[in-house]
Amino acid sequence: MNPLCCIAPVSIDDRTNPVVAKSSNHHLGLEAIPVSKHASKPSFSTQASWISQDQLERLSSEVVDDVNLDGKDASSSSNKGCFFFGNCVGAGAGVAGIMYKWVNYGKGWRARWFELEDGVLSYYKIHGPDKIVMNPSREKGVRVIGEESVRYIRKASCGSSNRLGASAVAASRPCKPFGEIHLKVSSIRASKSDDKRLAIFTGTKTLHLRCVSKENRAAWVEAFQVAKDLFPRVASGDILPSEDAVVSTEKLREKLLQEGVGETVVKDCEAIMLSEVSVLQNRLKVLTHKHIILLDTLRQLETEKIELEATVVDETKEHDSCCGQGRRFSDFYSVMSEVSASDSEADNESQDGADVESDEDDVPYFDTNDILSAEAMRSASYRSREAEGNGSIYDKDPFFSDRLQIPARIPQYPYVRRRDNLPEPKEKEKPVGLWSIIKENIGKDLSGVCLPVYFNEPLSSLQKCFEDLEYSYLIDRALEWGKQGNELMRILNIAAFAVSGYASTEGRQCKPFNPLLGETYEADYPDKGLRFFSEKVSHHPMIVACHCEGQGWNFWGDSNIKGKFWGRSIQLDPVGVLTLKFDDGEIYQWSKVTTSIYNIILGKLYCDHYGTMRIKGGSNYSCRLKFKEQSVIDRNPRQVHGFVQDNRTGEKVAILIGKWDEAMYYVLGDPTTKPKGYDPMTEAVLLWERDKSPTKTRYNLSPFAISLNEITPGMIDKLPPTDSRLRPDQRHLENGEYESANAEKLRLEQLQRQARRLQEKGWKPRWFEKDEEGNYRYLGGYWEAREKKDWDRITDIFKKQQQRNSLSSSSSSTFL
């Protein structure tokens, strides 16, 4: 398609210039109205006016200043309408003109020449006034929007009249558009807060445009709509196969009878053919219905992405530094009111964090990063208060000034050097599109969806449960605080532990293996002072139960994760209660928050945790944590804030602030009761900080997670045949043997289908049982059976005992 720029200039000769009217009493293009072929199409806006020869002469005689290409003074330009060149009437006519396109924060808004023809919007860079010249072969059908665009054309015509030879050569060399947008598959949105702006979304990119005046924008929007009307949307009923479709077999019958085939055989052939056609028709209906659903989903995604990306453009890149200090204080105080605004259970429901009007001003929100980056929090004195209380701001309990004394453990076990990376893959991983697999499971429970091994990480859900205990030292610290009589510091450390379990999910884009019914996992970490055991206790619903024994405490729980796919995201809702019991009798309980995985179809895949977590237990204090849902415009996502409340008085005695993938801090007291100007962050104390991996690893596993599937020397002979470390497909995936892993996964899925029949026949888990409240509790006896290697009553659920020998010989860890 020939552009309207980089073409030979328009001649000002009356005989060759199509801009010149044929008579003094006729406006341009007026004579073409009676023979318009597009009279049935919607007409253009009445803002478009016809330009006469006198008007053009006045325009060409004006002293026109150079147009500001940076768009700084574009709003001051005058535009009174749209102008037609040649015989231009109806919806089929081309449209052209100047609009300002958003480039980036460095360049801002830049002028571009736009041309709309046959439903395709093309745009070109403007390198000077001589470049905006229309092709004489096409200018008769061009409708130019805006006087600024006309000035450019007239200026180019006057300035280039003495270079007609060179222009003729240029006319034969069409300029390639800098970009093209097909309006048939695009959505147009006009800004509500700025009457000169609009956005065009194609599904893969968004053009943010600004016109010189609101009249120009109205003309462009109407032109876009007219162009879209040339390609009407097909109704869903128009593409569905007809219910009354009749298949005639008369010709087949005549042909068979002519060949001497008997009547009985002919009827059988007819019946077979009609049956096959009926099956094909039914399949076509199903495919057509899915096609309609997917189209509607994509259109909805288009609209949502337009709003979100327009919001990003509206966001100011830099903030005035003089307002930073005041905002930091006000944002901090807003934490208390924001967290305590609602105590209802409705907080656990999904919040539409992305539901933002794209063109409205940004609403101020709490910014954890402004606080975490404060200079006071980076000082050495702040770090030294990590394990201390602060009596200066909470002097009701004098023991806050004492340091926590944790008795040192004397190792009475051989130290095990654990691996710090996974084996190098033996095969090259094949790229597989996730959308192509899960598109047929929209709205379904994903626990029953079978995915290729390429979407898994070499860990099972049983091992993921133990990964939540990576920072178990926080429980040990809570135990010691309780021994010193400080229940407040105990619940603060428990809150930090509850948040720390989410740290390892950052950057993890693969799902763990779904355990087989009866599959188990053990973890004996004497260096941490704990041992852990978990078992899959139910197949439908899929429930995993776990139990952990520490020094002075026990931790247990069961988890039933309900997952659903909603087109653009996967939502995981955990069902179950986690319980922590200390030897002194105090019990604390909480439940996990909702997890969602976004951008399944388009964009960068990421996960987010959101909702409200309530930690109940103890006699004096309770805690409430709010995981803020991430939105597209969040500069600092993954925020967590909350407070500890004194159950006796109802007062807030401490607040917690941080991010679930970085660190958690606390401040004693209620900062909202302090005088104006008080900076609570000078008293902030670090509770927990994530151990960052020094190098990037496969599957983004942390060093702790890498050790979970390792078989250390001497372990293979003690493991039961149900342990996750012996699962063959998971082991093949860890070694990078993808073909073998896929084959084993299919084989085990066949075995897993028998699990439901076993459960229906009254199958019961070996190491857990339900209590009166319906929760699974550990029966005991596993570690005793492990010492005796008493696995006679344990079934080899993987049906591959020969694997144990190969694993025993390949173990690479050593005792020191």
UniProtKB/Swiss-Prot annotation:
PROSITE patterns: PH_DOMAIN. Keywords: Coiled coil, Lipid transport, Lipid-binding, Transport. Belongs to the OSBP family. May be involved in the transport of sterols. SUPFAM superfamilies: Oxysterol-binding protein-like, PH domain-like. Expressed in roots, leaves, stems and flowers. GO terms for molecular function: lipid binding. Gene3D superfamilies: 2.40.160.120, 3.30.70.3490, Pleckstrin-homology domain (PH domain)/Phosphotyrosine-binding domain (PTB). InterPro entries: OSBP_sf, Oxysterol-bd, PH-like_dom_sf, PH_domain. One of its GO terms (biological process) is lipid transport. It comes from Arabidopsis thaliana. This is Oxysterol-binding protein-related protein 1D. Residues 344-362 have a biased composition (Acidic residues). Residues 290-321, 735-764 form a coiled coil. PANTHER family: OXYSTEROL-BINDING PROTEIN-RELATED (PTHR10972), OXYSTEROL-BINDING PROTEIN-RELATED PROTEIN 1D (PTHR10972:SF67). Residues 340-362 are annotated as: Disordered. It comes from the Eukaryota. Residues 92-229 form the PH domain. The keyword Plastid does not apply.
